[in-house]
Amino acid sequence: MNTWASIVPLIGGETIAMENIFKTKPKYFLTFDGFQANEEHLLNYYNNEIPYINLSKGEKHTEGVDVVNTVCPCAGLSSLSPQAASNSPMNDWMIKSAEYVLTEVKPKVFWGENAPRLASKMGEPVVKRLRKIAEANGYTFSIFKTKSLLHGLSQVRDRTFYFFWKGDQVPMFEYIDRKPSLIADDIRSIKR
């Protein structure tokens, strides 16, 4: 059985998806000062039963896990942000979380979601920094840019996923191209 945790989860969707995949709750949540208001709903979802570790206060994780996920703020590279730039301080959350997870937790896989521009020329300096962190800690770094429409969803949303794989082997992802549902059908299918 795989064990897992989240760092700077921000939103619940990815964390809840991890629980659905692994059929087990996270061992802990890792966070930094400034994210508490955003994460409160996720803590409430788990009835405050999951250890909530604030790294800014010097708290430490208690055990290693196989997988760690993150949804770091993406405003640094978002096309919706007027301040988007490769040197935006918002991008530092990807760097800071990668440094902690890869040096302290040392999972088999650390992965996250970010804006599509992470896989573009604008994101290249960030990718280079992440790749250096990976190499320094015995990981291989990869990115995967996709669109929600390719996964059968009616929402138009481009995203980039980034991965740190322990060692030098990277799995080959299957190309997915599912016909998207219609938003009207999705709305009609909601149980009331």
Give each language-model segment a name.
Residues 2-58:
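SAM cofactor-binding core of SAM-dependent methyltransferases
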Residues 58-67, 74-192:
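Class I S-adenosyl-L-methionine
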Residues 6, 69-71:
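Structural cue for short, hydrophobic secondary-structure segments
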